[in-house]
Amino acid sequence: MYTKKYSQDIKINNPDKYNLSENIIWSSPHGFDLTMDIYSPKNISVHCPVVVMFHGGGFLIRRKEILNNMAQYIASNHDYIVCNVNYRLLRDQSNTVLFNDLIGDAFGSILWIKENIHKYNGDKEKIGITGDSAGAYICAMILNLGNKIGKKEDFEKDYAFEPTYLPENLSFCLLYTSPSPRDRVR
């Protein structure tokens, strides 16, 4: 009984509470448009914290749309900006996308958000990331990469992730991780 009443009190999607900016192209690696949807609360005068969402799908299937209900729920019931992000899948671009590429896409989206979220009334200093399945793994990689930013000469024997998006005032950025027995996942 309690569950039924509780679910009646929560509105999963109330578009009157948020603005939706759909399919914003934030980068186009090799002509492949990467998009995100941004949900921003209406009638909020302060900069809101940001939730960035990465979808699952085993790095091979699905797109950001599978998290639309979750994004709508957060936007309808909380004062957060929600960024629902697409990244390239391994099967995209005629199966030429490497695992490092999609991690670079995800990290690039965070850099884009930090540079642009103020336009949507978001606080670039308060960004949280979440994901389901493969998206959760991507979140773990992003958090790990943040500890490995450095100069190229410090990591010459390691593999590099290159973010898909770089802010205009940043001319070079490589993110390094230690070598893996596999540099390509199929």
Give, region by region, the residue ranges found by the protein language model:
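Residue in the alpha/beta-hydrolase core beta-strand immediately N-terminal to the catalytic nucleophile
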Residues: 126-128
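Short beta-strand element of the alpha/beta-hydrolase
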Residues: 47-56
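Catalytic nucleophile-loop/oxyanion-hole region of alpha/beta-hydrolase
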Residues: 63-64, 70-71, 83-124
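N-terminal cap/lid segment of alpha/beta-hydrolase-fold proteins
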Residues: 3-45
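Short mixed-charge
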Residues: 148-171
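Conserved small/polar residues in nucleotide/adenosyl-binding loops
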Residues: 176-183
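Short glycine-enriched nucleophile-adjacent loop
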Residues: 136-148
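Gly/Ala-rich beta-loop-alpha elbow adjacent to hydrolase catalytic centers
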Residues: 131, 135
